């Protein structure tokens, strides 16, 4: 039998203190009935003897301490899951937001999930085609990987997220592919863009959308990514789907953590974020992966904006320690009109070697990737030298590298947000660009591949 407590002692920001409680558990769900009869929800954040600290999801505005009642429900925050969620839009707490019918659940699952036993994990090894050359060709995404996008304020990460969600697929696989998209603390304009883009392109048919808006309570932001990941785990490990989870913008999630931490008067860590930020982020990122004996998988692309474009800020810094690489968006490329403005040199996919090559992409993938990286790096150096010494100071080879660098940005990296390139098109485009350079400079590609793939009429001896 559930007890109802009228012993609310204090409300501070999103937190409520309830006195005289019995048999209450950490993370337990709470229903608060305020004096108007409105029901609000919260969860137990801390227990000390007979006192429970409750975190309110809908905020504390309008709560009268004397007229409020708290009921502890004996279970954690859960989400109702079903395959019928595909094609639907939900709010940050998993409630339908698209005026569609209520979901009839096949299961109700704890949003905190169950940690995957490291021994049960399967190593990521299958190529995921995003249709974006800068990712597919140079920083390959592998099924089961967690690969974040580091963006900056004002950069087009929303368009990139929508493009990946629309175009991503696993090659040579009969399994169903699904996208779980969670937007955390976004504006009305961004929410409208995502819903319209998914709907117009038909991508919504294979997607589940969770939308937490900027005017929703900050506490809800802490639950939204977990709602999305729990849904992804259900679709992947119980329905055998390949699930791509896109989380944007996790900077807003971390700001919500900092807000709750400050309300609890915890000792702050770097830049005011809680000392457990690393651990908390790990509870999200480590829910990606593959499990032995299970057909499905979860691949994660968390997107975060770096405050002041600072890679050493705690959020991107700690994210980089947990995840397997990063895709970095460049403000310089954005000003040049390169879309998407992916800076391939500091970007990295630590698992790319496992998802490319014969039988996965193409035999020449690794060699061309290395040569494109080297050529672009040398092209940037040549252009920097020309700025200092003048173009006349460059050798003929340096001029060709500078030409290659410009062509690489305009043709390879820049493709717009609607072009969907196959991996064959990406690799062939790479060869076309490499033909700008003298053949003697292509030292990272074995001769057999040069003979087979280098365009004969363009290559220079």
UniProtKB/Swiss-Prot annotation:
Entry-linked SUPFAM superfamilies: P-loop containing nucleoside triphosphate hydrolases
The entry's keywords: ATP synthesis, Hydrogen ion transport, Ion transport, Transport
Matches recorded under CDD domains: ATP-synt_V_A-type_beta_C, ATP-synt_V_A-type_beta_N, V_A-ATPase_B
GO molecular function: ATP binding; proton-transporting ATP synthase activity, rotational mechanism
Pfam family, one: ATP-synt_ab_N
Coiled coil: none
One GO process term, biological-process aspect: proton motive force-driven plasma membrane ATP synthesis
PANTHER family recorded: V-TYPE PROTON ATPASE SUBUNIT B
Protein family according to the UniProt entry: Belongs to the ATPase alpha/beta chains family.
Function: Produces ATP from ADP in the presence of a proton gradient across the membrane. The V-type beta chain is a regulatory subunit.
Protein name, as recorded: V-type ATP synthase beta chain 1
Provenance organism: Clostridium tetani (strain Massachusetts / E88)
């Amino acid at each position: 039998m559930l007890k109802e407590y009228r012993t609310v002692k204090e409300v501070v920001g999103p937190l409520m203190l309830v006195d005289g409680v019995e048999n209450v558990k950490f993370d337990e769900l709470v229903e608060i009935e305020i004096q108007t009869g409105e029901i609000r929800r919260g969860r137990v954040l801390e227990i000390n003897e007979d006192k429970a600290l409750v975190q309110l999801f809908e905020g504390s505005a309008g709560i009268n301490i004397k007229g409020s009642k708290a009921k502890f429900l004996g279970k954690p925050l859960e989400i109702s899951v079903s395959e019928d969620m595909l094609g639907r839009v939900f709010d940050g707490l998993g409630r339908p937001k698209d005026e569609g019918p209520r979901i009839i659940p096949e299961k109700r699952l704890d949003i905190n999930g169950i940690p995957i036993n490291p021994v049960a994990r399967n190593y990521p090894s299958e190529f995921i085609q995003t249709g974006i050359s800068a990712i597919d060709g140079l920083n390959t995404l592998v099924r089961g990987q967690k690969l974040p996008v580091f963006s900056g304020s004002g950069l087009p990460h929303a368009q990139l997220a929508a493009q990946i969600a629309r175009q991503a697929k696993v090659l040579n696989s009969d399994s169903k592919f699904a996208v779980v998209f969670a937007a955390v603390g976004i504006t009305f304009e961004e929410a409208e863009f995502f819903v319209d883009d998914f709907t117009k392109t038909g991508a919504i048919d294979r997607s589940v959308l969770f939308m937490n808006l900027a005017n929703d309570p900050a506490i809800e932001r802490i639950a939204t990514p977990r709602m999305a990941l729990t849904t992804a785990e259900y679709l992947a490990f119980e329905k055998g789907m390949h699930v791509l989870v896109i989380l944007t913008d996790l900077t807003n999630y971390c700001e919500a953590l900092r807000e709750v931490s400050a309300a609890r008067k915890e000792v702050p860590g770097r830049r005011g974020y809680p000392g457990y930020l690393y651990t908390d982020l790990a509870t999200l990122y480590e829910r990606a992966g593959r499990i032995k004996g299970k057909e499905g998988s979860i691949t994660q692309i968390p997107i975060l904006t770096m405050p002041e474009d600072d890679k050493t800020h705690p959020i991107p810094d700690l994210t980089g320690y947990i995840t397997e690489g990063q895709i970095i968006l460049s403000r310089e490329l954005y000003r040049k009109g390169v879309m998407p403005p992916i800076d391939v040199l500091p970007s990295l996919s630590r698992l790319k070697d496992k998802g490319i090559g014969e039988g996965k992409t193409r035999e020449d993938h690794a060699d061309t990737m290395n040569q494109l990286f080297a050529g672009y790096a040398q092209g940037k150096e040549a252009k920097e030298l020309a700025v200092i010494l003048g173009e006349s100071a460059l050798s003929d080879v340096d001029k060709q590298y500078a030409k290659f660098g410009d062509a690489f940005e305009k043709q390879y990296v820049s493709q717009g947000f609607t072009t969907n390139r196959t991996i064959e098109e990406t690799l062939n485009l790479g060869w076309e660009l490499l033909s700008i350079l003298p053949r003697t400079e292509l030292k990272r590609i074995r001769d057999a591949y040069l003979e087979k793939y280098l365009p004969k009429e363009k290559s220079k001896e």
